[in-house]
A protein has these predicted regions:
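Membrane-proximal alpha-helical signals and transmembrane carboxylates
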Residues: 1-340
């Protein structure tokens, strides 16, 4: 875990499992230190630890929002790229709060959970599988950091009671964290960045208001989304990027009020309402990312590939904010269960 310290230094916290055949209950060893470099901090810990600490065994690196906001992650990561014994497959994760506090609480208070490193790895992998966050490892964080026209995105976690919750994702611009999105917004972003294929993404939809239906189960529906296709068209008009994002979804009604969904007219009405809802949320998400100057979709990279002369003439992050980006969504309900 890494967070800021006085004088521009780093507060580092290392959590390591204790492997002892005489100990029946799994436990960990935690070391807090402060240094100007991660390598120096590791040497400090090795002078105190009963076991030699090897960076190649690191599974997860937790950064505070302050460090992420200062744009320090890329430079801190340099040791993992330079030293072949270090782990470039470790997760890069931003913590809403103190990484030091999170590591200590996970070790001391999460008595009903697996070992902290295993627990965190499991919830991160599960969140990626449900499109609640994006998988980001050291190697692809560093690659995107040096690629023009695309910005990083990392998982965002937080302590919640006696557990850790994946809140969504942290968004970056020019190497600095500039915003966050929740788990549902991350699912929609995944459909525009990559694809929802092989993901189990459940969308929390709101239904058309009906008189005398005030309970939440009457006003909402859980729809499991499947992505059929994605297409992004990029062009330059009047010296401005024009981008059209086409998304085609189908879905299952996992949870829905008792209704006549076996009626084709009702299904069509549902399709149209839900299609418009997803389109509006995707458009709202695009506008938010433009406002904060974050381009995790890599629209700039597409402009660079197709209109390289134009890309070289402009400052992409400034141009991106005023680009005309429009989302187009199709949706069709394919399964809803037999309730009659």
């Amino acid at each position: 875990g890494m967070e800021t310290a006085p004088g521009g230094n780093l507060k580092l916290t290392y959590g390591m499992p204790v492997i002892d055949p005489d100990v029946t209950k799994s436990r960990g060893e935690i070391f807090d230190t402060e240094a100007n470099l991660t390598r120096i901090a590791r040497d400090n810990v090795n002078r105190r630890s009963g076991k030699n600490m090897l960076a190649g065994k690191i599974q997860i690196i937790l950064f505070s929002k302050e460090i992420a906001g200062q744009g320090r992650i890329y430079d801190i990561n340099s040791i993992f790229e330079r030293d072949p014994s270090d782990a470039i497959l470790a997760w890069v994760v931003v913590v809403d709060g103190s990484p030091r506090s999170l590591i200590h609480q996970a070790e001391d208070n999460f008595t009903d959970k697996p070992r902290p490193s295993i627990y965190m790895n499991e919830i991160l992998e599960r969140a990626v599988a449900t499109a609640s966050t994006i998988e980001t490892r050291i190697y692809n964080y560093d690659l995107i950091s040096v690629a023009p026209g695309i910005d990083n995105i990392t998982p965002l976690i937080k302590i919640a009671d006696k557990s850790i919750e994946v809140k969504g994702s942290a968004l970056f611009s020019k190497g600095k964290m500039v915003g966050t999105i929740n788990a549902q917004e991350n699912g929609l972003l995944t459909s525009m960045m990559k694809t929802l294929k092989h993901k189990k993404f459940t969308y929390n939809a709101s239904l058309l208001p009906v008189a005398d239906e005030s309970y939440s189960e009457k006003q909402s529906a859980a729809i499991q989304l499947f992505q059929n296709s994605k297409k992004i068209k990029v062009s330059i008009r009047n010296n401005k990027p024009v981008v059209d994002i086409y998304l085609d979804f189908s879905g299952n009604a996992d949870e829905y009020k008792w209704d006549n969904l076996n009626d084709e007219k009702e299904v069509k009405k549902f399709d149209e309402h839900f299609q418009e809802q997803i389109q509006q949320e995707c458009q709202k998400l695009i506008e938010y990312m433009q406002k904060i100057g974050s381009d995790p979709i890599g629209i700039g990279d597409m402009v660079r590939a197709k209109n390289n002369d134009y890309f070289k003439k402009v400052d992409w992050h400034t141009t991106y904010k005023s680009a005309q980006i429009t989302t187009h969504v199709k949706f069709h309900l394919i399964e809803y269960g037999d309730i009659q």
